[in-house]
């Protein structure tokens, strides 16, 4: 397997134009404790704001699909994909480009910030699951 850089790919800046915003619905009660419902409301509002400018997809546990759809309305898509937490920027895939229109996905090995959370197997499978 080759490395993306060997094939002429590089990681665009976070602010570079892209075709979709991916988010993960907050699920880990230990992270958010009594604030989980409020955090979900904020995530929903952020998704709706972004959706005014570009497509947004929430990955969500199968049991939360209806809740996410109800919370975000028709302007935000959902994808049923089991996960442990909502930090998709850390455990999700990276999309690299070659500057000629080609896009590739990269999946890194996720270990929940040095095994901070022992239960992170579903998060470790998110990037490969999206790719």
Where is each model-derived feature located?
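The feature marks the mature, well-folded catalytic cores of soluble enzymes
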Residues: 1-131
């Amino acid at each position: 397997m080759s490395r993306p850089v060997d094939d002429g790919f590089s990681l665009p800046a976070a602010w570079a134009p892209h075709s979709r915003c991916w988010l993960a619905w907050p699920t880990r009660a230990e992270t958010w404790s009594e604030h989980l419902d409020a955090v979900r409301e904020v995530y929903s509002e952020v998704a709706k704001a972004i959706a005014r400018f570009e497509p947004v997809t929430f990955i969500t546990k199968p049991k939360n699909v209806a809740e996410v759809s109800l919370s975000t309305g028709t302007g935000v898509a959902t994808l049923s994909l089991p996960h442990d937490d909502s930090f998709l920027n850390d455990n999700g895939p990276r999309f690299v480009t070659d500057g000629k229109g080609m896009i590739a996905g990269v999946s890194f090995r996720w270990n929940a910030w040095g095994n901070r959370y022992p239960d992170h197997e579903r998060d470790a499978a998110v990037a490969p699951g999206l790719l």
